[in-house]
Regions:
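Hydrophobic targeting segments
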Residues: 1-6, 30-31, 39-43
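Short, flexible/disordered intra-domain loops and linkers
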Residues: 11-22, 78-81, 178-189
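C-terminal catalytic/acceptor-binding lobe
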Residues: 178-264
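Active-site-proximal specificity loops/subdomain of glycosyltransferases
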Residues: 49-103
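Short, acidic, metal-binding catalytic loop of nucleotide-sugar glycosyltransferases
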Residues: 21-38
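Short beta-strand-to-loop acidic/aromatic patch adjacent to the donor-nucleotide binding site
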Residues: 102-114
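Conserved catalytic core of nucleotide-sugar-dependent glycosyltransferases
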Residues: 116-185
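Acidic ATP/Mg2+-coordinating residue in the GHKL
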Residues: 45-47
Length: 264
């Protein structure tokens, strides 16, 4: 069994709740379009989001975790701190659930990204005992609809980039009280600072294998905290230069494989 873990933000941490739910629904459609049906999708959330998608393969795991606010920080830093702490704790709650249900693998899937319909089939048929990481993927810029940009070292850029054996993944030996932990906790931070997951697994003696095809799409849009807070916006000249040099037109085949919505 393959489990997608989707940590979904708390309603009080966003002023774009309706939009976040719409984007989540697009992610669910993508995750559930697998050619191999041996999967399930867990959405770890405070409030069950408003989605109209047929949720046969989806389960909403509600958590009662307080939102932890930093004592002193700028508004932008506060938002980053809150979302990272919230996301990391929800990931740990999801890993616990995937262990309880004896999943072979779990994948942390950000609530706005898309995945290849071939991903579950590849992982379950190859059966690497430790797991995988996505080294090749695509990025979609909302300001340049109709195009994707292929990315190397995809796992450096996007959190939807590792598939792990839940029994070999970093996880506390004893239960930690997630209601008190913040993004500074090692296990909370480990999955949020995603670029280091492959090297961390290798140091533990559980090296990951790269997926040999572009397996996910990182969506870069105005609801993405990295796109709006941590990274200055590209100039129009830079955007269109990248389009000319690196742009890949979204074909019918790509739309089918990743369940790319018409808005992209």
């Amino acid at each position: 069994m393959f489990t997608f873990l989707i940590p979904f933000l708390a309603k009080c941490t966003t002023n774009k709740w309706k939009r976040a739910c719409q984007i989540l629904e697009e992610t669910l459609r993508s995750a559930c379009n697998q050619t191999d049906q041996r999967f399930r999708v867990l959405i770890i959330c405070h409030e069950v989001p408003d989605v109209s998608f047929d949720k046969q393969k989806c389960e909403f795991i509600q958590v009662n975790l307080p939102i932890i606010y930093p004592l002193t920080a700028s508004p932008a830093q506060q938002m980053i701190f809150m979302q990272r702490s919230d996301k990391g704790r929800k990931i740990l709650a999801g890993i616990k659930e995937s262990r309880r249900n004896s999943s072979h693998y779990f994948m942390v899937l950000d609530a706005d990204d898309l995945v290849s319909s071939n991903l579950v089939s590849y992982c379950l048929n190859q059966q690497n005992p430790n797991g995988y990481f996505i080294n090749r993927g695509y990025r979609n810029d909302a300001q340049l609809p109709g195009y994707l940009f292929q990315r190397k070292n995809f796992y450096h850029e996007c959190g939807s980039s590792f598939i792990l054996n839940p029994y070999r993944a970093p996880y506390p030996d004893t239960n930690i009280d997630l209601t008190k932990e913040t993004g500074e906790n090692y296990f909370v931070r480990r999955y949020v600072v995603h670029a280091y997951v492959p090297s961390c697994m290798e140091k533990m003696g559980f090296p990951l294998q790269p997926i040999p095809f572009p397996a996910a799409i990182y969506r870069f849009h105005d609801s993405n905290i990295y796109a709006t807070t941590l990274r200055p916006p590209d100039s129009a000249l830079r955007r269109y230069g990248r389009l000319l040099l690196k742009g890949k037109k979204i074909t019918h085949q790509l739309r089918t494989e990743f369940t790319i919505p018409p808005s992209m």
